[in-house]
Amino acid sequence: DKQFHREYLAKDITNYGGGNNRGPQLWEGKAISWHSQMQFAGRITKTRVPDHGWYRITIHDLDAINPGSDGYLWGTLQTGSGYSNEPLLYPLGIVEATQQSKTKILEGWMQKDHMLVFKPNEANLKNLPSKGGSFSFEGRNFEKMGFAGFRFEKITIERIYPVGDRKKVRSHLFADFDLEELKA
């Protein structure tokens, strides 16, 4: 099996090009994924994985911007194609953040060519304004405007093998069974 290990710095996963921008904002060297109820908000297009499999996702130096009155901000980490031609998103986990930075590690199954979708996801939060299905960050300070967001330094994605690589799994399943006997 191929090894896969990638580190995505904030500057690598934020997008300000034209088109349908729904990804994180780059602000003071960190990525910020803001709350929005728009479909696929929080998608991180560069995090597509090359194969179906189990992955460990590490969100480094994560903290909450404008958390709720209890000091917490809750959200979701999901995977999917990130586009309307394949609209389903698959849960990887629930994420909790406070104003104190921490590293979060989640593990889950990802399909080939799927990306991460990461955003705050509480119903009572202010919804980030969007125009034409896209976010415009230019000239706006969403933190000062009271919007909630997840701020982080980078994301690491690595392929893992919880019960072993392909050879080890085959050994566990079939032990000493000779597959050639079936052909006879």
Language-model segment annotations:
Residues D1-A184:
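Low-complexity, glycine/serine/threonine/alanine-rich intrinsically disordered linker
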